[in-house]
Amino acid sequence: MSRVLIAGCGDLGCRLGVSLSEKGHEVFGIRRDASQITPPIHPIEADLFSQLPELPENLDYIFYIVSAPSYNDVSYYKAYVMGLKHLIDALKDQSPKRLFFISSSSVFAQSEGEKVTEDSPAEGKNFSSRRLLEGEELALNAPFPGTVIRFGGIYGPGRTYLIDMVLQGKAHCMEDVYSNRIHSEDCVGLLEHLMEKPDLDTLYIGVDDEPTLTCDVYEWLAEQLSVSNIEHREPTENSRAQRSNKRLSNAKVKATGYQFKYPSYREGYSELLESL
């Protein structure tokens, strides 16, 4: 069994840590408020934005799963660059088998509905993308092997924004705009799967099988919830929705043997709706 460190042990990190612990791995989690770390993860109370305390020895795998506390350049720099620098420095006397850096598919600049793979160019067109790409470069140039996973939009328990908007009658969708998503359980499953693979590439896209027109998702949810009047809008050129208009391919990660529990939004949201 392996010794695993999860830096940034929030919702996704705790889900991963608990799952790994249940499989017999020894898992440590870093969080500013260690009381929020779910047992049986071993808590480490520390701030990644400051110098870190001495870390557990003989770590095999590192997961960097940090979220910026707010949407501005300083927050993104601290979360994806400064924090990672501090972590790599704290690991200077160790030789983990791999560092996994959790990034975002938002670094892909394509916005005309194109098919996007790991070979497609990524561009730092805004501060968030620039900082994420800077963090990716740091991870891949660390003194131990690194792999970047660019997740699409994550949904699942506790991440029910679309459902809430539809139920409240506040939902509107952008016409002819594709969106890409992944259930949080598949995020965990995918990371566990990759951790067990000895030979990995440096970059994987983490999304389900089905890039989907945003309005199709909203309309399907509205039908399941017996809600009408989903407002359709034309996307503006610089809107966030328009910037996300691409069709991400998961062919590379599926080629590693991973099988999605929720291959599309229908399976994932159906289960969420049943739990309401």
Regions found by a protein language model. Name each.
Residues 41-90:
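NAD(P)H-binding glycine-rich loop region in Rossmannoid oxidoreductase-like domains
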Residues 86-125:
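Conserved Rossmann-fold NAD(P)-dependent oxidoreductase catalytic core, especially the SDR/UDP-sugar
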Residues 112-148:
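Catalytic helix-loop patch of NAD(P)-dependent Rossmann-fold dehydrogenases
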Residues 13-14:
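N-terminal Rossmann-fold NAD(P) dinucleotide-binding loop
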